Amino acid sequence: MKKVLIGCLGILLMLGLTVFWYLSRFDSEQDLPETAQSTLRETHTGPVLGFSKNDVNVWLGIPYAQPPVNDLRWRAPREPVSWSEPKNATQFGEACPQGALGLSGSEDCLFLNIWSSQSEGSSKPVMFFIHGGGNVIGSADQGGLYDGQRFASEHEVVLVSINYRLGPLGWFSHPALRETESKAFAEDDNSGNYGTLDIIAGLKWVQKNISSFGGDPDNVTIFGESAGGW
C-alpha cells in the first residue's frame, strides 16, 4: 500500500509540473531588457552583452554547445561556433523538446544563463543549477520560476543554470545510430547519455569562462531540483 501511495504521489507531482510548464508557455511576452555596456564580457567563443537588474548583472541564453540537430542529433555536444560581434544575451533560450500534453521546445536548446552579484571583492563562489522534471520535461527558466536574480544578490554568488537534452533525445542508444558515415564520431558519441554529456559540457564552459563573469572556477557547487539533484 505504501509503495502504491508513493507511486501515486510521484505521478501527481509529475502531472503538476507538466501542467505548470505548459500554462507558463501562454504567459504574455514582456519587453526585453535593454543591454548594458558594463555587462560586455568575453567568452572563449565570442563576446556577450547582458543587462543589469537591481544589483545583479544578468546574461541569458548563452550557447555552450552547437545546436544538436541533423548530424549532431544523438551525438556528444560539440563546441559552439565562434562569433565576433557581441551576442545579445537578454532572453532565455528555447527549452529542449518535450511533451506529455503536446510537443514544445526546440532542438536548438543548449544554452546557459548567468546571474552575478555586483558586490566588490575577490572572485565569487559559483552555484551551478540543474533543473528537474524527470529528465523528460523542464528548462533552465521554467516559465520564469527559476529567475536567479534574488539568489545571486542575497548570497553574493554567481548562479549558472542550464538547458540539457531531455527524453529520447537526451538518453537513447541504438546500433543504427552508429551506422551513419555522415559525421565523424567523437569519443562519447556512442554513450547514449547525451543529456548528461550536455551538463558536463556546461561545466567545462564554466571552467573556461566564469572568471570573466566574476566567478571562481575553483569554487563551483553543483545542485539541482528533483532529477537535477540526483
What are the language-model segments listed below?
Residues 1-4:
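Positively charged n-region of N-terminal signal peptides that target proteins for export
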Residues 7-193:
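Non-catalytic accessory segments of hydrolases
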Residues 20, 143, 217-219, 229:
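Non-catalytic, mobile gating and regulatory segments of ester bond hydrolases
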Residues 125, 206, 213-225:
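Alpha/beta-hydrolase fold nucleophile elbow
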Residues 135-136, 224-230:
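Glycine-rich nucleophile elbow surrounding the catalytic serine of serine-hydrolase chemistry
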Residues 165-168, 223-227:
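Short, solvent-exposed turn/loop segments enriched in Gly/Ser/Thr/Pro and often Arg
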Residues 193-200:
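A generic "alpha-helical surface" signal
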